[in-house]
A protein has these predicted regions:
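Short, low-complexity N-terminal intrinsically disordered segments enriched in polar/charged residues
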Residues: 26-67
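Active-site micro-motifs of SAM-dependent methyltransferase domains
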Residues: 52, 74, 162
Length: 178
């Protein structure tokens, strides 16, 4: 059987193009799943700003809402989801009563890149500020599970879920193994 040189070159060219496309596509996916040092810092700042916003109710809840993507959502301890900035600002207003009475300590932040942005987990301890004879005390805690997206305004929460430590699910073991 005689095979023409042109047919061999054509077949090899098709195979090379297919391999090049596969390598390029997988390289782009791997590159998309990377975060820069600046990304890590910005995401940590987002979480720190969240603690201040939720504790103080800054700007009538609007600072809290601005930390979420326009279609972002927060899921509370019961799994109820509040979605969209207007609803999130209203949630922050409802949950802030008078002078600051609690402080969120958000610690042990783990951030992992994804093809869409990043995910994160961190622990929460809530300190209740004492009044009169009542001393300060830790009155709650749990952990957050976050989905972050990069927007034109910087990193924002796409979704944030609070899971209480009392009887709630534990953080997944996958995150601890990384």
């Amino acid at each position: 059987m005689i095979v023409s040189y042109a047919r061999v070159v054509s077949t090899v060219s098709v195979i090379c193009v297919a391999l090049l496309w596969t390598v390029t596509a997988s390289g782009q996916a791997a590159q998309a799943a990377r975060l820069t040092p600046a990304d890590y810092i910005e995401i940590r700042q987002l979480v720190a700003r969240y603690a201040y916003a939720v504790d103080t109710g800054a700007d009538n809840g609007n600072v809290y809402a601005s930390l979420f993507a326009p279609d972002g959502a927060f899921a509370d301890r019961m799994g109820r989801e509040t979605k969209g900035r207007d609803a999130l600002a209203a949630l922050a207003r409802r949950n802030t009563r008078g002078p600051q009475s609690a402080i969120h300590f958000i610690v042990n932040h783990v951030i992992e890149p994804t093809s869409e942005g990043a995910v994160g987990k961190e622990y929460l301890l809530q300190l209740r500020i004492g009044e009169g004879e009542r001393p300060n005390d830790i009155f709650g805690g749990g952990h957050y599970e976050d989905v972050y997206v990069k927007t034109p305004d910087g990193w924002r929460f796409k979704r944030r879920q609070f899971i209480p430590s009392e009887g709630g699910p534990r953080p997944s073991r996958d995150a601890a193994a990384r």
